[in-house]
Amino acid sequence: MARMVRRNRKIVNYSEFGDFEDGDEDFACIAAPLTKKSRTQPKEPKKENKKKQKTQKEFTSSQKQSPIGRTSLDDSFCERDLNVTLALSIKEKSANILEVQNSKEQGQVLDDDIPRNGCRQWTAASKAFSHQKLLTIDSCDREHVTDSEPVTIPDEESEEDSDYREGNDEDCAMEKMKINGMKKKIKRQTRKEKKTPKSENNTTVMELKSEQTQKMMSTSSEPVGRPLYTSSPVTNKKPKWVPPGRACAVSFL
């Protein structure tokens, strides 16, 4: 272990400096000279000044660069208009959705409120209208006969009627039977009208054939010449048959 080294201390005699009466003057408050600064002043203001200078420099540099990257007034107005239109379109979509929902609900309520007792009146009017249509179609088909397909009446009215005829099953069945009967009649008439020209053609062909057969019969019924040799009554031999061509030749000779 190293031993502690004792330092030599000097002893000061204050009596050498003079009287102690003037000792208080040394501790008196004396104003510092103007040229020197006090050590107690804080150092923070320097930092603040530096920060201010930096901000000013940045601001000036941004002002210099701003004309290049600055947006024009027209562009800014366009952006505002776009934002406004987007907001309005979103609001309109929401309003349209609400209107559609309300209209659907109102339509369901109206359908429920329709009375079924008035179905008969509506069906009677539809009957009259369909009957008139059928009559006009019959007249047109009789006047203008063509080789086209038979006329078919659309079943839209019958389908619409069936939706409103749930309460009156008997009336609906009778009406359907009548409509089907009218359709069958129209189809039969068109088929008959198509068959009539074919029958006329057949009759003309038969007449031509009959005329030809009559001519053939008339030619075959011409008189045949007499035979050259006649058999005697004594003998029982049969006479020989001679064709008509030879007989004619012999007679000419």
Curated annotation (Swiss-Prot):
Keywords: Chromosome, DNA damage, DNA recombination, DNA repair, DNA-binding, Meiosis, Nucleus. Residues 32-51, 190-241 are annotated as: Interaction with DNA. Residues 154-169 have a biased composition (Acidic residues). GO terms for biological process: DNA damage response; double-strand break repair via homologous recombination; interstrand cross-link repair; meiotic cell cycle; positive regulation of double-strand break repair via homologous recombination; positive regulation of reciprocal meiotic recombination. The keyword DNA-binding applies. Residues 199-222 have a biased composition (Polar residues). It comes from the Eukaryota. Residues 184-195 have a biased composition (Basic residues). Residues 33-74, 141-169, 184-244 are annotated as: Disordered. It is found in: Chromosome; Nucleus. GO terms for molecular function: D-loop DNA binding; DNA binding; DNA secondary structure binding; double-stranded DNA binding; single-stranded DNA binding. GO terms for cellular component: chromosome; nucleus. Monomer. Structure-specific DNA-binding protein involved in DNA repair by promoting RAD51-mediated homologous recombination. Acts by stimulating D-Loop formation by RAD51: specifically enhances joint molecule formation through its structure-specific DNA interaction and its interaction with RAD51. Binds single-stranded DNA (ssDNA), double-stranded DNA (dsDNA) and secondary DNA structures, such as D-loop structures: has a strong preference for branched-DNA structures that are obligatory intermediates during joint molecule formation. This is RAD51-associated protein 1. It comes from Gallus gallus (Chicken).
